[in-house]
Amino acid sequence: MQLTSFTDYALRTLIYLASLPDNEQTNITDVTELFGVSRNHMVKVINRLGQLNYIQTVRGKNGGIRLNRPAKTILVGEVVRDLEPLDLVNCSVEFCHITPACRLKERLYRAKLAFLAELDDCSIAELLDDNAELLILLQKA
């Protein structure tokens, strides 16, 4: 399973925000420069993360973005579920005539559950725990 670039940058953004000292905020420009992504794409990512209440966005001169809740409470699987279309294949009878007898869809469903279970076992905070190399790379913003 491959995550969309949208989800990839959303996860990277959450990791970066979690690396900041408590209550410190950053801005979209810093995030776009850190990850080398277009500002337009990052604005969409930030807006969606704000809509989902993962981050707090503040407009204006002293505005910025920061996590809206502790990183230890944000599970990677939760973020992926919120952002990804998780239907691996289209198994509707209109699309595939073998659907009524197909055993693949059940295997794919179980594989998706296993994938998400693994991601549910990891919080954004855990990705930073004892990871000095990552913290150094994130400070380049």
Curated annotation (Swiss-Prot):
Cofactor annotation comment: Binds 1 [2Fe-2S] cluster per subunit.
Cofactor: [2Fe-2S] cluster
Molecular function GO terms recorded: 2 iron, 2 sulfur cluster binding; DNA-binding transcription factor activity; double-stranded DNA binding; iron ion binding
Binding annotation for [2Fe-2S] cluster: 91, 96, 102
Limits of the HTH rrf2-type domain: 2-129
Alphabetized InterPro entries for the sequence: Tscrpt_reg_Rrf2, Tscrpt_rep_HTH_NsrR, WH-like_DNA-bd_sf, WH_DNA-bd_sf
Keywords carried by this UniProt record: 2Fe-2S, DNA-binding, Iron, Iron-sulfur, Metal-binding, Repressor, Transcription, Transcription regulation
SUPFAM superfamilies: Winged helix' DNA-binding domain
Keyword Cytoplasm applies: no
Domain of life: Bacteria
Iron in keyword set: yes
Any one of the GO CC terms: cytosol
GO term, biological process aspect, one: negative regulation of DNA-templated transcription
Annotated region of DNA binding: 28-51
Pfam family, one: Rrf2
PROSITE patterns, per database record: HTH_RRF2_2
NCBIfam families: PRK11014.1, rrf2_super
Function (record text): Nitric oxide-sensitive repressor of genes involved in protecting the cell against nitrosative stress. May require iron for activity.
Name under which the protein is recorded: HTH-type transcriptional repressor NsrR
Species whose genome carries this gene: Vibrio vulnificus (strain YJ016)
Organism placement in taxonomy: Bacteria, Pseudomonadati, Pseudomonadota, Gammaproteobacteria, Vibrionales
Name of the gene this protein is made from: nsrR
